[in-house]
Amino acid sequence: MFKNPEFIRNTWTELTAKKLAAMPLLLITVYLLAYILDEALPFSFLPYICVFFYCVFTYVWSTRLAAETVIREINANTWSFQVMTSMSPVKMAVGKLFGSTIYIWYGNFICFALYLLSYHLHRERLPEVPLPELLTNVLIFVLFGLSAQILPLLLSLHSIRWRHFFEKFDVTFFQFMGIAMIIPLYKVFNGSGEGIVWYGAHYTAKEAAVVFLSVFIVWGFIAIVNQIKTEFGQEPYPVSWFLFTLSLVAVLFGFNDYGSDNPLVRYVGTLSAFFAVLAVTYLTLCGESNMALRPNMVSKYYHGKQYKRLFMIMPRSLVTIPVIIVLALVLSAEFGSLGQEQGTSAGFMVWAMILFMLRDFCFIYRWSLFAQGNEKETTVVPVLIALSTYTIVPVLLYHFDLRIFCPFFMPYFHESSYLTYNESAFLTVIPPALEFVFMLVLLTLGIRKKFRELRV
């Protein structure tokens, strides 16, 4: 880190002599005043003063700095010079994330020291808290602080792919997403004392926070590195995205409660993983831009037998398809083990969702293949069109009493009086299967047409 030029540059900019002297002077002065006033009260509020300053520094100040660290470079037209340097994406990520907020952490660690000191000075007027638990609290504060900084920086890096100038409102929005991390912090210390059960073991709220925040920070930092790789003209490895989806599934799968008789509670982890990966896939489609299909590059790499490069330009949304299909198989097996008709219909509903998703993939890729102008720069429009078929169209069909057509626009089960329950459930997958085949044929014809144009 100390051989990182970006980190060193930001450190010299942030840690000036005046600022280094001002921070402890401010905090110690306020602490001494609070200590004097605190003597007249029946209980001590000194630790809460320290936590208050930590929250102000972290959630108000550092989130702003993290959101602005790249946007300032964009607005000042200096980001392009940094992109052309020989610095690695990892060093740039470390420099931007930790260098721009190092002064905040200088103040935060002073707050942490005063926080621990408060429990030593006023042991008789504060709840007895063992030192290991106090150190765990400090660790949680650090993890929440890093998470609150990673989120706005990641959002700002993602947004610069589409725009090259930003207003204060944009930065405030990114900052607000980091500020929102204060809500789970409050719940950990005040609202979730019972903890959770994960993979059959009971964890307190603080233990769960350490585990899940650590996972979030690791993948958040990897995502920042991948975004910077894209800015540097390098393609991030699809393997990292695949491993991220697997880790997301592994985390959520642990919430299954196999001791419950309620299927929704019993398989809540698998259901959450399925819908989470499904949602992440659609969000990825929105952000892939014209990377969704690169027929000219595909043709070039394929005929040149550059299979590694061909693998590198694979759309991230395609990487998640095997994960979603495996989750669908697991859900089908779990619902099938219930031995109930409802389990059979639920299994068919899951596969109907898969077929609708594949239909949307074909439609969105077909759109991006021939989109022109701004439409080619983003797949947001076709994604919104595809998702509207699950909301607007079914509502209209319900309004005009045309429910018989709902299975063509959303996973919909209707028990027919002319068929058995299982036959009615099977019919759930027929409409999306037909639509998927139709869109797949259109996509195939479009790809062939595009390749013919490239040969000419």
Task: Show which residues each predicted segment covers.
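Hydrophobic alpha-helical transmembrane segments of membrane proteins
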Residues: 1-76, 95-456
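Short helix-to-coil transition segments within interhelical loops
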Residues: 81-90
